[in-house]
């Protein structure tokens, strides 16, 4: 029996036929290089790039938070035990009373006052007792009282106090100022109290990164002759110079 085999004829490519695309070359490691713009972040190189971008964003965010805390309203309020050898007694007014509204703010000013109370015994401790009673029902408060030997701290520096008489005016004494009362009691040493107030002012300016141009008088915010003795004597510029001298020591 004879079996016949018919061989298939070879296929001829048409002269107009397009060549079949070749597969993409593989790298030495046997992997094809990633296609640009497609699933790039799914590749090792893409993941490294993404990680680098995330790190850059995190570093920038941390730097921004640090700047805000350093320069903004979130800076922790100071609570010194002493300032250049002058003892500081912290005795905050209770939260929720009329004289402590609890409004947090950015510190922009240190506002200088005098108590206006020349009576014997009207020192810093006496004014601390007074403000703890008065602030229960009245919108009256300040941050520090200073006499010739000590300082009382009545409110956190980052909270509003009612001392400047300008309500909550933007960039005002109440909203953005730390109120310091200087005692003028006749049985005290006024000049030494002023010197201690200069030390405290220098400390606060240094802590909050402010210059002496941020020292204000009560009378800068409303029409009131305060600090009266200092203003009447034309001694405020000398007070600012004294503050600068203490700042230079810090």
Role assignments for model-derived ranges:
Residues 1-39:
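N-terminal targeting leaders characterized by basic, low-complexity, disordered sequences
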Residues 2-3, 40-43, 48-52, 63-87, ...:
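Basic/polar, cationic surfaces and motifs that engage anionic cell-wall
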């Amino acid at each position: 029996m004879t079996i016949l085999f018919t061989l298939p004829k070879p296929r001829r490519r048409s002269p107009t036929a397009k060549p079949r695309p070749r597969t993409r070359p593989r790298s030495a490691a046997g992997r094809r290089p990633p296609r640009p713009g497609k699933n790039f972040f799914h590749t090792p190189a893409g993941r490294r790039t993404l990680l680098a971008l995330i790190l850059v964003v995190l570093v920038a965010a941390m730097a921004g938070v640090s700047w805000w805390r350093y320069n903004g309203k979130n800076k922790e309020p100071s609570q010194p035990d002493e300032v250049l050898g002058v003892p500081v007694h912290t005795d905050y007014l209770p939260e929720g009373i009329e004289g402590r509204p609890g409004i947090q703010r950015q510190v922009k000013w240190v506002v200088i006052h005098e108590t206006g109370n020349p009576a014997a015994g009207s020192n810093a401790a006496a004014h601390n007792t007074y403000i703890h009673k008065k602030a229960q029902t009245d919108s009256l408060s300040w941050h520090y009282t200073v006499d010739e030997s000590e300082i009382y701290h009545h409110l956190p520096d980052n909270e509003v106090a009612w001392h400047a008489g300008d309500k909550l005016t933007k960039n005002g004494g109440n909203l953005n100022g730390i109120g310091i009362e200087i005692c003028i009691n006749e049985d005290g040493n006024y000049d030494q109290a002023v010197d201690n107030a200069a030390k405290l002012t220098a400390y606060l300016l240094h802590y909050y990164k402010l210059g002496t141009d941020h020292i204000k008088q009560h009378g800068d915010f409303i029409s009131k002759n305060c600090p009266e003795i200092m203003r009447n004597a034309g001694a405020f510029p000398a007070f600012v110079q004294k503050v600068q001298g203490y700042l230079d020591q810090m």
